[in-house]
Amino acid sequence: MKHFLEELIIAALAWVPTVAGMGARLLLWRPLFKRCGKARFGTGIAMQGCKNMSLADGVRIGRGCQLYAEGGTLDMGEDAALSPGVTVDASGGLIRIGKQVAIGPGTVLRAANHCFDSLEKPIMLQGHLYGEIVIEDDVWIAANCTITPGTRIGHGAVVGAG
Protein backbone atom coordinates (compact mmCIF):
# COMPACT_ATOMS: atom_id res chain seq x y z
CA MET A 1 0.00 0.00 0.00
CA LYS A 2 2.86 2.39 0.86
CA HIS A 3 4.45 1.83 -2.57
CA PHE A 4 1.10 2.54 -4.24
CA LEU A 5 0.68 5.81 -2.30
CA GLU A 6 4.20 6.89 -3.24
CA GLU A 7 3.48 6.29 -6.93
CA LEU A 8 0.14 8.09 -6.62
CA ILE A 9 1.75 11.19 -5.06
CA ILE A 10 4.44 11.25 -7.75
CA ALA A 11 1.97 10.80 -10.62
CA ALA A 12 -0.54 13.32 -9.26
CA LEU A 13 2.02 16.13 -9.18
CA ALA A 14 4.23 15.18 -12.13
CA TRP A 15 2.43 17.36 -14.67
CA VAL A 16 1.34 20.35 -12.55
CA PRO A 17 2.78 23.35 -14.46
CA THR A 18 4.33 26.66 -13.34
CA VAL A 19 6.24 27.66 -10.25
CA ALA A 20 3.29 26.49 -8.13
CA GLY A 21 3.80 22.97 -9.49
CA MET A 22 7.52 23.10 -8.68
CA GLY A 23 6.73 24.20 -5.14
CA ALA A 24 4.08 21.51 -4.67
CA ARG A 25 6.44 18.82 -5.96
CA LEU A 26 9.20 19.85 -3.56
CA LEU A 27 6.82 20.10 -0.60
CA LEU A 28 5.00 16.81 -1.18
CA TRP A 29 7.79 14.74 -2.76
CA ARG A 30 10.52 15.68 -0.25
CA PRO A 31 9.32 13.21 2.45
CA LEU A 32 9.53 10.34 -0.06
CA PHE A 33 13.34 10.61 -0.29
CA LYS A 34 16.04 9.31 2.03
CA ARG A 35 17.29 12.92 2.02
CA CYS A 36 16.19 15.88 -0.08
CA GLY A 37 17.51 19.42 0.14
CA LYS A 38 16.08 22.39 -1.72
CA ALA A 39 15.76 20.66 -5.08
CA ARG A 40 13.84 21.77 -8.17
CA PHE A 41 11.71 19.26 -10.07
CA GLY A 42 10.46 19.88 -13.62
CA THR A 43 7.27 18.40 -15.04
CA GLY A 44 6.71 14.83 -16.22
CA ILE A 45 9.27 13.19 -13.94
CA ALA A 46 8.98 9.44 -13.23
CA MET A 47 10.54 8.01 -10.05
CA GLN A 48 10.69 4.71 -8.16
CA GLY A 49 12.68 3.84 -5.06
CA CYS A 50 12.84 7.40 -3.69
CA LYS A 51 13.67 6.05 -0.22
CA ASN A 52 17.06 5.07 -1.69
CA MET A 53 17.78 8.53 -3.16
CA SER A 54 19.61 11.46 -1.57
CA LEU A 55 19.39 14.85 -3.29
CA ALA A 56 21.49 17.75 -1.95
CA ASP A 57 20.57 21.45 -2.01
CA GLY A 58 20.37 23.01 -5.45
CA VAL A 59 19.77 19.77 -7.36
CA ARG A 60 17.74 20.37 -10.53
CA ILE A 61 15.80 17.59 -12.24
CA GLY A 62 14.62 18.59 -15.73
CA ARG A 63 11.28 17.78 -17.31
CA GLY A 64 10.72 14.20 -18.40
CA CYS A 65 13.60 12.75 -16.36
CA GLN A 66 13.38 9.23 -14.95
CA LEU A 67 14.97 8.30 -11.60
CA TYR A 68 15.04 4.72 -10.34
CA ALA A 69 16.75 3.25 -7.27
CA GLU A 70 14.81 0.10 -6.32
CA GLY A 71 17.33 -2.08 -4.47
CA GLY A 72 20.09 0.46 -5.19
CA THR A 73 21.39 3.87 -4.17
CA LEU A 74 21.33 7.24 -5.94
CA ASP A 75 23.24 10.18 -4.42
CA MET A 76 23.30 13.61 -6.08
CA GLY A 77 25.61 16.38 -4.83
CA GLU A 78 24.95 20.10 -4.46
CA ASP A 79 23.89 21.97 -7.60
CA ALA A 80 23.95 18.85 -9.79
CA ALA A 81 21.65 19.28 -12.80
CA LEU A 82 19.87 16.76 -15.01
CA SER A 83 18.71 18.25 -18.33
CA PRO A 84 15.35 17.19 -19.79
CA GLY A 85 14.93 13.52 -20.65
CA VAL A 86 17.81 12.11 -18.58
CA THR A 87 17.42 8.57 -17.20
CA VAL A 88 19.27 7.65 -13.99
CA ASP A 89 18.70 3.99 -13.07
CA ALA A 90 20.58 2.98 -9.92
CA SER A 91 18.40 -0.11 -9.35
CA GLY A 92 20.53 -2.91 -7.93
CA GLY A 93 23.69 -0.77 -7.85
CA LEU A 94 25.06 2.64 -6.92
CA ILE A 95 25.14 5.92 -8.81
CA ARG A 96 26.94 8.83 -7.14
CA ILE A 97 26.83 12.20 -8.89
CA GLY A 98 29.12 14.90 -7.46
CA LYS A 99 28.71 18.63 -6.90
CA GLN A 100 28.16 21.03 -9.82
CA VAL A 101 27.73 18.21 -12.34
CA ALA A 102 25.80 19.03 -15.54
CA ILE A 103 24.25 16.10 -17.42
CA GLY A 104 22.96 16.82 -20.93
CA PRO A 105 19.56 15.91 -22.38
CA GLY A 106 18.84 12.32 -23.32
CA THR A 107 21.75 10.89 -21.33
CA VAL A 108 21.33 7.47 -19.68
CA LEU A 109 23.15 6.35 -16.52
CA ARG A 110 22.42 2.72 -15.69
CA ALA A 111 24.00 0.75 -12.82
CA ALA A 112 23.09 -2.57 -14.46
CA ASN A 113 24.11 -4.22 -17.70
CA HIS A 114 23.28 -7.48 -19.46
CA CYS A 115 25.59 -10.45 -18.98
CA PHE A 116 26.81 -11.81 -22.30
CA ASP A 117 29.51 -14.39 -21.48
CA SER A 118 27.89 -17.38 -23.18
CA LEU A 119 27.70 -17.70 -26.95
CA GLU A 120 25.24 -20.60 -26.62
CA LYS A 121 22.69 -18.82 -24.45
CA PRO A 122 20.63 -15.80 -25.60
CA ILE A 123 21.75 -12.57 -23.95
CA MET A 124 18.25 -11.95 -22.60
CA LEU A 125 18.52 -15.19 -20.56
CA GLN A 126 21.96 -14.51 -19.04
CA GLY A 127 20.85 -12.12 -16.31
CA HIS A 128 22.29 -8.80 -15.27
CA LEU A 129 25.52 -7.48 -13.84
CA TYR A 130 25.21 -4.67 -11.26
CA GLY A 131 27.85 -2.15 -10.33
CA GLU A 132 28.72 1.44 -9.54
CA ILE A 133 28.89 4.68 -11.46
CA VAL A 134 30.81 7.52 -9.80
CA ILE A 135 30.85 10.99 -11.31
CA GLU A 136 33.15 13.32 -9.41
CA ASP A 137 32.63 17.08 -8.93
CA ASP A 138 32.59 19.70 -11.71
CA VAL A 139 31.85 17.33 -14.61
CA TRP A 140 29.94 18.03 -17.82
CA ILE A 141 28.35 15.08 -19.61
CA ALA A 142 27.02 16.21 -22.99
CA ALA A 143 23.74 15.16 -24.63
CA ASN A 144 22.78 11.57 -25.41
CA CYS A 145 25.67 9.83 -23.64
CA THR A 146 25.31 6.36 -22.09
CA ILE A 147 27.19 5.61 -18.86
CA THR A 148 27.32 1.98 -17.70
CA PRO A 149 28.43 0.19 -14.48
CA GLY A 150 32.10 0.24 -13.55
CA THR A 151 32.54 3.84 -14.74
CA ARG A 152 34.32 6.55 -12.77
CA ILE A 153 34.46 10.03 -14.31
CA GLY A 154 37.12 12.22 -12.71
CA HIS A 155 36.94 15.76 -11.35
CA GLY A 156 36.55 18.41 -14.05
CA ALA A 157 36.07 15.94 -16.93
CA VAL A 158 34.04 16.62 -20.07
CA VAL A 159 32.30 13.66 -21.72
CA GLY A 160 30.82 13.96 -25.21
CA ALA A 161 31.38 13.71 -28.92
CA GLY A 162 34.05 15.96 -30.49
What are these regions (language model features)?
Residues 46-55, 61-151:
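Flexible, glycine/small-residue-enriched loop-and-beta-strand segment within the central core
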Residues 14-15, 45-47:
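Short histidine/acidic/glycine/proline-rich micro-motifs that form metal-
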Residues 1-38, 100, 106-107, 113-119, ...:
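Terminal amphipathic alpha-helical/low-complexity segments used for targeting or macromolecular assembly
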Residues 40-42:
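Conserved short histidine dyad/triad with adjacent acidic residue
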